[in-house]
């Protein structure tokens, strides 16, 4: 499937930072592609530049404010639609890792596609590295949170920082934490 466009995301579950979705059509074979989660940071960084050199690609960022306003599913779907719109002249076949196509007829879906298809692996790497670099770049602006260490994910240290300092403007305010006494509808439980 030479003209297949692989699509994957990074940042669906973190407490802070953007959702990043990438679409990739490989123009040349690239050795070493795999799901970004199983590759070392060094390997992802090396492959990132090679993927950009040897592909047609499009990357979409949805910030925390948009995620809070519209929801993660809306952001994911609108990002996929933007990718399809930007890459449709190069491909008529779009495949995403996962179990839903969000009602987008042209989009095929397959669980673990990021480990099975080079194009989806490449998209996984572009999304992950783009998001990680963004979190590293903004970390000095939010020194209390150490985003460069956990990239906004819900680590123990990150949750402790939220407990101490509250959420910043790049935190997802609609993502509630049981560790903070928040329930599923966002109301703090009574202390009495």
Swiss-Prot record:
- Main location class: cytoplasm
Keyword terms of this UniProt record: Cytoplasm, Endonuclease, Hydrolase, Manganese, Metal-binding, Nuclease
Per the record, the domain of life is: Bacteria
Reaction equations catalysed: Endonucleolytic cleavage to 5'-phosphomonoester
This protein's record includes keyword Hydrolase: yes
Q: Which gene encodes it?
A: rnhB
Q: Which InterPro entries match?
A: RNase_HII, RNase_HII/HIII, RNase_HII/HIII_dom, RNaseH-like_sf, RNaseH_sf
Q: What is its EC number?
A: 3.1.26.4
Q: What does the protein in this record do?
A: Endonuclease that specifically degrades the RNA of RNA-DNA hybrids.
Signal peptide positions are none
Query: Which PROSITE patterns does the record associate with it?
Result: RNASE_H_2 (PS51975)
Name its co-factor(s).
Mn(2+); Mg(2+)
**Cofactor detail note:** Manganese or magnesium. Binds 1 divalent metal ion per monomer in the absence of substrate. May bind a second metal ion after substrate binding.
- State the organism named in the record: Aliarcobacter butzleri (strain RM4018)
Q: Which residues bind a divalent metal cation?
A: 8-9, 97
- Location(s) in or outside the cell: Cytoplasm
The segment(s) forming the RNase H type-2 domain are: 2-187
Q: Name one GO molecular function term.
A: RNA-DNA hybrid ribonuclease activity
The cellular component terms of Gene Ontology attached to this UniProt record, alphabetical and capped at eight, are:
cytoplasm; ribonuclease H2 complex
- What name does UniProt use for this protein? Ribonuclease HII
Kindly give the SUPFAM superfamilies that the UniProt entry links to this protein.
Ribonuclease H-like
* One example of a Gene Ontology biological process annotation: DNA replication, removal of RNA primer
Q: Which family does it belong to?
A: Belongs to the RNase HII family.
